[in-house]
Amino acid sequence: MASGPSVFLLNVSGQIESAEFPEFDDLYCKYSFVYGHDWAPTSGVEEGISQITSKSQGGKQALVWNFPIEITFKSTNPFGWPQIVISVYGPDAFGNDVVRGYGAVHLPFTPGRHARTIPMFVPESSSRLQRFTSWFMGRRPEFTDPKVVAQGEGREVTRVRSQGCVTVSFNVVTKDLKKLGYNTGSGDFPNATTMSQP
């Protein structure tokens, strides 16, 4: 007698499509996945770095990367559902690479194609003296580990400033979630076009 599945799978492919940073140009991004203890990547790439892109000449002036992402996870429970953390970098006035934004978003729960716009932020110096010193030395405040963005610990005392946004598209496939008793809501509701009208 065959037993049921003991894990479920989450496969995500897609791309880091573009960004809007009105004040900056010639940016690149790094991404990594953050997930709970019960999760394990089974295939794909956990972190990567994109090419440098310049603003398009059109009216929107978007920074287009179209950088592919693909990863498969296995888990026994949804606690610690994976998040993608994106860090954007670019040159400052002195040519030093500095962080231009951090952001994170959970991978979508439901199968299908999804697009997410991630608001980005940067850490701020807490005093004018620190701000001047960091500008003069060419070292702006940044996280030693960008994955801290996906965690809540210590974030309440971090001073940040909103700056730009990044658009990411996801294609999500799940396997055996329903067999383990987890309902993501997909496919459980009748299609509005096939419902009978009173």
Curated annotation (Swiss-Prot):
It is found in: Cytoplasm, Cytoskeleton, Cilium basal body. Residues 8-126 form the C2 B9-type domain. It comes from the Eukaryota. One of its GO terms (biological process) is cilium assembly. One of its GO terms (cellular component) is MKS complex. Signal peptide: none annotated. InterPro entries: C2_B9-type_dom. The keyword Cytoplasm applies. Belongs to the B9D family. Component of the tectonic-like complex, a complex localized at the transition zone of primary cilia and acting as a barrier that prevents diffusion of transmembrane proteins between the cilia and plasma membranes. Required for ciliogenesis and sonic hedgehog/SHH signaling. Part of the tectonic-like complex (also named B9 complex). This is B9 domain-containing protein 1. It comes from Xenopus tropicalis (Western clawed frog). The gene is b9d1.
